[in-house]
């Protein structure tokens, strides 16, 4: 009964999310559907020399037009569900831990994801209204739309009369300039775009690629935001992350960790469409595979996206993350 209550409460909270976040289904072709059972666990350690009372924020898979999410269980049981200003839903657990005590948090989710592609013949896109522009084209810490170099490149390579053509041109340019390497920090668009002997390149991982694309799209008047979650290589996977070895692993962590970030843009009549250029190193404008699991959106807040956003303690230390994905096609 308790698990059913958790599911019901989460659904009621998520249903309150603004319709704008789900987007439109006009001109969109939905194809395969995959149902995942996701089991996760997070190891927290109290490294302080006193007992701590900690509120731990647990990222939950979100509901979108192409993803339905259900919480089947969380232990310890959450004291509440909370929505942030970007519309993301978190479970909040209250933990009391003695000095050096280790505590596991266990979660189980059911997530149904649909692959989709937009029908580009349906529309060239319509430029957004003022409210969307105001919210989704502003400058932020990592998306500096006042950087004249970034803005000039965006206009040179992607300025067109139609938003969809602009996004497609921009995606082609960005994916052709990627110098991929794991970045445990976050450079932001100002520092991710560098000039080399081969011209401008984007140095970093999925976060830097997304940051540069979002900044350029916003500078061109296209509403854009970041999405964080997972990109799987198959429907059944075991993924884990040991925070104590991340620094030394480098690109080796990609063999067992698929935490991911990618951009979304808003183009009427399609609504929010994904642009994951690192899925097969292709522009992928409005082409989305069911190997993605969405855990949240970045519009104004920043959680670390690809690494630590799964579980966010206030005073304790996150030491280990483990996920098992069991997906069934059909």
Please annotate each region the language model reported:
Residues 47-49, 98-103, 161-163, 218-220, ...:
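A short, structured loop/turn motif at beta-sheet edges
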Residues 300-330:
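TerminUS-proximal long segments
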Residues 211-307:
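Hydrophobic/aromatic-rich core segments of domains that either
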Residues 97-200:
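Acidic low-complexity segments
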Residues 1-30, 56, 263, 330:
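Secretory targeting signatures
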Residues 18-116:
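Intrinsically disordered, low-complexity N-terminal segments that are enriched in acidic
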Residues 166-170, 202-217:
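Active-site nucleophilic cysteine motif
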Residues 71-75, 121-133, 277-282:
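Short intrinsically disordered coil segments
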């Amino acid at each position: 009964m308790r698990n059913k209550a958790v599911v019901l409460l989460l659904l009621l909270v998520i249903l309150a999310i603004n319709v704008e976040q789900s987007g439109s289904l006009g001109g969109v072709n939905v194809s395969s559907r995959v149902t995942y059972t996701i089991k996760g666990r997070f190891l927290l350690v109290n490294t302080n020399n006193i007992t701590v009372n900690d509120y731990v924020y647990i990222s939950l898979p979100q509901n979108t037009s192409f993803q339905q999410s259900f919480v089947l269980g969380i232990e310890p049981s959450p004291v509440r569900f909370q929505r942030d200003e970007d519309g993301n839903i978190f479970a909040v657990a209250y933990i009391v831990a003695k000095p050096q005590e280790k505590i596991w948090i266990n979660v189980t989710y059911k997530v149904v994801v649909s692959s989709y592609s937009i029908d580009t013949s349906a529309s060239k896109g319509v430029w957004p209204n003022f409210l969307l522009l105001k919210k989704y084209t502003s400058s932020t810490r990592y998306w500096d739309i006042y950087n004249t170099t970034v803005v000039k490149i965006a206009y040179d390579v992607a300025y067109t009369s139609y938003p969809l053509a602009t996004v497609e041109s921009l995606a082609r340019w960005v994916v052709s300039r990627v110098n991929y390497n794991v970045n445990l920090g976050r450079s932001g668009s100002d520092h991710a775009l560098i000039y080399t002997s081969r011209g401008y390149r984007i140095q970093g991982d999925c976060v830097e690629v997304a940051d540069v694309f979002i900044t350029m799209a916003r500078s061109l008047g296209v509403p854009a935001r970041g999405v964080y979650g997972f990109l799987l290589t198959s429907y059944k996977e075991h993924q884990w992350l040991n925070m104590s070895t991340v620094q030394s692993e480098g690109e080796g962590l990609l063999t067992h960790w698929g935490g991911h970030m990618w951009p979304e843009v808003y183009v009427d009549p399609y609504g929010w469409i994904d642009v994951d250029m690192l899925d097969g190193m292709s522009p992928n404008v409005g082409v989305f595979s069911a190997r993605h699991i969405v855990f949240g959106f970045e519009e104004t807040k920043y959680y670390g996206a690809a690494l630590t956003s799964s579980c966010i303690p206030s005073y304790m230390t996150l030491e280990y993350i483990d996920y098992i994905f069991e997906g069934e096609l059909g």
